[in-house]
């Protein structure tokens, strides 16, 4: 009987393991993420909760009889909704994923073998139940190995960057990094041969790849977006990508799940200033204003503001001012704080304000960030689906409030994530604001369903709940027409419940 239970658990581990490996890959191989998502999935909806209860009953019963242990592999038909293939993010069998899969499989087999040796149905069942944690253990064990394997590409990138002689502009922030990078690269391209890191290539291996593949001979400025999930990451990046100019765009409750506080976010991101000649800091947030004052005692700081605050570069309404003097009118629908930082970067690199102002026309726009278009059916579409944050979501609602031709207004959203303990409150507040502007709210998925329903419940907007973005898009197509407008606010990948 023990052998049969072990065989059943091994067989059940294959589809279950593929599901959780996909989560690991989508979460950038961060140890601990798989178990976190397992907790979310097994408590999402009555069916998954029922399957979780079945597994727990099987584990408890297996203390007395191995027969009870068979409930654990049977329950691996769940969690319902998390597929092996994926809709938006299919499993990609990269070399790194294969290494994780092999090590996780070896750990799981060792646990099952231990259960057989001890003749313990519980020990075998707990191995399958804790499969997400075993994958996290494999990720943790392989972390140093992956880092050493990546050193070759990092060393090559560092040598290539040094040989180019290019000046480095490094940009970080809780949000707005990519848009600021695009603005800065556009403004600088009028005077320098400029290369910017593509898309959201903002970590160690992404930036190494960007430099190795895109930094051509003759490049004069390299604009690097730098992200972080914790202290020390940006410090390590600046060791081999030393910035001449370092910019901090914005601070907000993004990735609070990992950082725990905005003060810790500032401390981690402020590492970008340590090796820079000039720092450009958007001082609209009190923590960044305090940082600018503190760092200004030891290095040159260019203060900027997108909200008309006291700073060297400020955008007040639509007026761009430098050192208190009006210099130009900002283009419509521009992200003001991001533009202020980009102008500050140009000034820090020695460009004249006239050179920068002459490049304002044609500022690029990052994809899926408050992009306004018109559908074939004649309704207005606002696409703000990339990495939603509270400030950006409020701004997107302002866009929805301004557009449309008198028809219905709809908000489609799964809510915001990685906001730590403030996540429920921020989503309730967003739903409340959305209900005040929109006629209809379409809630996607289960991650923030309860908070969004609570936030919208006291207002006049009607609510529809759907399981996936595809269902939400179908609803919009069936219900909206000419004169209507829809805001798509955030789009969670389908490894979220």
Region roles according to the model:
Residues 179, 202-205, 232, 337, ...:
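Residues that form or flank phosphate/diphosphate-binding pockets in enzymes
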Residues 184, 188, 207-211, 339-349, ...:
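Buried hydrophobic packing segments
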Residues 202, 229-232, 260, 334-337, ...:
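Charged, alpha-helix-enriched surfaces in structured cytosolic catalytic cores
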Residues 3-283, 287-297:
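Phosphate-binding loop of NTP-binding sites
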Residues 248-380, 405-407, 432-440, 446-463:
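Acidic, Mg2+-coordinating active-site environments of NTP-dependent enzymes
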Residues 172-175, 198-199, 226-227, 250-251, ...:
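Fold-independent oxyanion-binding glycine-rich loops
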Residues 1-144, 347-354, 358-368, 372-497:
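ATP-dependent carboxylate-amine ligase
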